[in-house]
């Protein structure tokens, strides 16, 4: 009886450990699937629009942006926008599907496509990218500077985890309505103190005549005491492919992205082998014990 209870306890501990180890991988895959569905729904809503609808949406967005002489940035981006926006003019622009999705961001080098939501409330940043209310909408144009924020290192989603791999000259793309805008990385500020409001506000301000987007996240990985700002400046989009990875790059990235899954599988196989060996060893001992008892009785 005691041996059965020990086996049951061992099994439960194994399942609990397996669940803890599997959670990041499973939850990240779920978020990836959810993001792909959001983007598909957005693209479907956009494709259902009529030409006059596009004109109306673009005009409303540009009119909203025209009220910004400069970006209104007050301190740190994260957690700065927790108010309910659903009755505001801001919520009404670029909300064609009615779910708060403005468009989506694609970064080929790190193989991500993420929906862009209105605002930077924490519930938004747990699952996707938030547009910082008070900065230019991600629609491009002269004298605009949009700020898009996302977390790094969340157990449930990768989001901007790999954004530190971007270098000057790398490309990212923003899809809004019927337009794709290409941005080339031209500035990276990798260790800005989150309390250095002056530097943050200066780095995120509109520059006269420029069309810029800054990707904003936490750094160092797992510490999050500073901010990483990756700025891109608009360049012509000529319909180029947004896939830059070679087959080898894709394989290496897959290994990197699924390292936890491989670790879990390795641990599972190792534990399975241990359990099988334990079972065979116990069975062998029982047979030996049985033979010894028989010999004792015969004697």
Where are these regions (language model features)?
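Alpha-helical transmembrane segments of integral membrane proteins
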Residues: 6-14
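Solvent-exposed, low-complexity, intrinsically disordered
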Residues: 295-299
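Extracytoplasmic/periplasmic soluble domains downstream of a signal peptide or transmembrane helix
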Residues: 2, 6-7, 20-38, 117, ...
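Juxtamembrane "stalk/linker" segments
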Residues: 29-96
């Amino acid at each position: 009886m005691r041996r059965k209870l020990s086996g049951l306890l061992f099994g439960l501990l194994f399942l609990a450990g397996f669940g803890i180890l599997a959670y990041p991988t499973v939850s990240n895959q779920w978020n990836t699937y959810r993001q792909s569905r959001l983007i598909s729904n957005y693209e479907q809503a956009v494709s259902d629009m009529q030409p006059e609808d596009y004109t109306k949406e673009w005009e409303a967005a540009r009119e909203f942006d025209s009220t910004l002489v400069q970006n209104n940035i007050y301190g740190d981006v994260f957690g700065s926008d927790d108010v309910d926006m659903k009755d505001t003019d801001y919520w009404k622009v670029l909300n064609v599907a009615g779910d708060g999705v403005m468009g989506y961001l694609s970064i080929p080098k790190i193989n991500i496509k993420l929906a862009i939501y209105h605002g930077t409330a924490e519930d938004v940043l747990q699952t996707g990218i938030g547009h910082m209310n008070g900065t230019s909408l991600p629609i491009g144009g002269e004298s605009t500077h949009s700020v898009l924020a996302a977390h790094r290192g969340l157990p449930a989603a990768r989001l901007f985890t790999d954004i530190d791999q971007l270098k000057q000259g790398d490309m990212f793309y923003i899809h809004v309505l019927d337009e794709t805008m290409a941005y080339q990385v031209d500035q990276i500020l990798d260790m800005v103190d989150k309390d250095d409001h002056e530097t943050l506000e200066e780095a995120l301000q509109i520059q006269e005549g420029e069309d810029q987007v800054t990707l904003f996240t936490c750094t160092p990985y797992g510490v999050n005491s500073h901010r990483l700002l990756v700025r891109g400046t608009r360049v012509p989009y000529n319909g180029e492919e947004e896939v830059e990875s070679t087959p080898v790059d894709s394989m290496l990235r897959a290994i990197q992205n699924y390292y936890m899954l491989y670790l879990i599988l390795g641990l599972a196989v190792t534990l399975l082998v241990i359990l099988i060996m334990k079972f065979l060893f116990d069975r062998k001992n029982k047979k030996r014990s049985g033979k010894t008892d028989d010999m004792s009785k015969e004697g």
